[in-house]
Amino acid sequence: KENSELWFSWNPDQPTDPIDKLLRGKDRIKAVVVEANWKDNPWFPEVLKNEMEQDKKRNYDKYLHVWEGKYREIFEGTVYADEVRKAIEERRFTSLPYDATRKVETFWDIGWADYTSIWFAQVVGNRFHIIDFYQNRMKPLNHYLSTLQNKGYIYGADWLPHDSDKHDPVSGRTYKEVMLGSGRDVRVVPMTTVEQGIGAVRTIFNRCYFDEHKCETGIYHLKRYHYDDKPTPEGLKSTRLPVHDEHSHAADAFRYLALALSDAEPRRKLNYRKRNVV
């Protein structure tokens, strides 16, 4: 109806939440959004101010979310809570331009009904620049190879999981042989336990810098990757493993990245003169 108005009041949680995408997203409808918090309350009581100051000292993430209305960054029971918190404090979720003088390596978790997830990384000295992320499902391998080609990066190795001998449902050939046949430099990450992979991620995470825009979806999944909090039945050995859900695939691909790069030496820039590139 003409001149109708709809009023919403909400506490932001994630930029992917429907209400946020509707009213604050890049394709938002015609809307007026006003951010209001404790600073806008002229009758803000001293008892709440004291509680707020305590939260600020004890749990800064909670303070930002509850009192300042920022998106929630850290979640209870998440696998990489400490690593993510430190990356936020050190501003390692940032803007990372692609360096055309360095090769891009890709790290895959392969699925069909589940997601195929791919991280794109460059080794810059002692740092790992995670410059891009892509995932999709129910797509043939050629779709992903075309996506890589269209990004225009100069590629190094493609790191596949240990089960890369599974067959592409469309071509009937294995992922590994199709990629080798297309001229890709294919490497296979050795099989390890999930715990070993998580340990590798913890080891290298402080060397990782992420492009917060191109890796937004992947970062979201890393933040949400969480342990199963179901109690272990009496008499059984406790096996605290992450839940297998929609966040697992990006996290699995990142484990392969960590395992592949754990022993990476600092990489030099490409010498275009030696490669006869103008």
Q: In which residue ranges do the predicted regions lie?
A:
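Short, conserved catalytic or adaptor-binding loops enriched in Gly and charged residues
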Residues: 23-28, 85-89, 95-97, 177-181, ...
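A residue-level signal for conserved active-site and pocket-lining positions in enzyme catalytic cores
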Residues: 9, 36, 67, 118, ...
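Acidic, glycine-rich loop-and-beta core segments that form the ion-binding/anion-interacting portion
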Residues: 96-135
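Hydrophobic/aromatic beta-strand patches that form the interior of the parallel beta-sheet core
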Residues: 7, 32-34, 106, 159, ...
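Acidic, Mg2+-coordinating catalytic module of metal-dependent nucleases/exonucleases
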Residues: 244-265
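Mg2+-dependent endonuclease catalytic cores in nucleic-acid-processing enzymes, primarily RNase H-like
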Residues: 119-243, 262-278
